[in-house]
Regions:
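PP2C/PPM-type serine/threonine phosphatase catalytic domain
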Residues: 1-277
Length: 277
């Protein structure tokens, strides 16, 4: 599946580049894969995740074959996130990583995240997020953390145990079980109006809204130029963090859709509170 894309990245004013990313066009499985991992407390967790998460996911898909049934891909992706988290713990590192992964095939999309790496679609003149920023002060995240005996302490920003400004991540072994690797996974079909996607670390989103990013990327035209413009704009607005931006040109992909707008068919989130039916 040929999808045109652009990538831009910068270390910012940080001592180390802790972001990693990957683009894969898997002809055998028919999947196009785009991933961004934003590390913290070191780069090892992000590097491990970039190396193993999608590899594990693709292996599970091959093992399941065509008879996996409804929800199999989402469950396989959840397993990949949890297996990656175990591999990070096995390496003995205390580093962690936010993550967002997007997979496209002829039948639809699968998007997942932990933490504050974000996937945003353009839909006509508006932005639609496929991910949720997992912040500790979200009521459902605070309730989950406190039910496990943890705390959310507001310093400069709300932090788990006064330390981490996100409630879900890969790694961060010292903060378990309060910081969970359980991903939020969204499955569905893109519509003809979904002609552009942005995947980026929070170095971008801290200074640009989703709507601003989509507008800038669309006006830039080519995906490589769009990624460059987004990174440069974020830096110009004062972002000092690592920034990684991937822009996907989905015009050809979305044009074949039988739907006009985005259609979500399933959300899998085992860490979310169970609501009464």
């Amino acid at each position: 599946m040929k999808i045109r894309y652009g990538i831009a990245e910068t270390i910012g004013l940080r001592r180390e580049m802790e972001d990693t990313h990957s683009i894969r066009d898997e002809e055998g499985s028919g999947l196009f894969c785009a991933e961004v991992y934003d590390g913290h407390s070191g780069s090892l967790a992000a590097a491990i995740a970039c190396d193993v998460l999608t590899t594990y996911f693709l292996r599970r898909l091959r093992e399941g074959g065509s008879g996996g049934g409804n929800g199999f891909m989402a469950e396989a992706l959840r397993e990949a996130y949890l297996a990656t988290d175990r591999q990070i713990a096995d390496r003995g590192t205390e580093s962690g990583a936010a993550a967002a992964t997007l997979y496209l095939n002829e039948r639809g999309f699968l998007a997942a995240n932990v933490g504050d790496v974000r996937i945003v679609l353009k839909e006509g003149g508006r932005a639609v997020a496929l991910t949720m920023d997992h912040k500790p002060d979200l009521p459902e995240e605070t309730a989950r953390i406190e039910a496990l005996g943890g705390s959310v302490i507001s310093l400069d920003v709300p932090r788990v145990e006064g330390l981490l400004a996100m409630s879900r991540a890969l790694g961060d072994t010292p903060l378990k079980p309060f910081v969970t690797p359980e991903p939020r996974i969204v499955e569905g079909v893109l519509g003809r109006k979904n002609d552009l996607a942005i995947i980026a670390s929070d170095g971008l989103w801290d200074v640009l809204t989703s709507e601003e990013a989509v507008t800038l990327a669309y006006r830039a035209g080519e995906p490589k130029e769009a990624a460059r413009v987004l990174q440069a704009t974020a830096t110009g607005r004062g972002s000092t963090d690592n920034i990684t931006v991937i822009v996907l040109d989905l015009k050809a992909y979305a044009a074949a859709s039988e739907h006009y707008r985005l259609r979500v068919t399933r959300i899998l989130d085992r860490a979310a509170p169970t609501r009464p039916s």
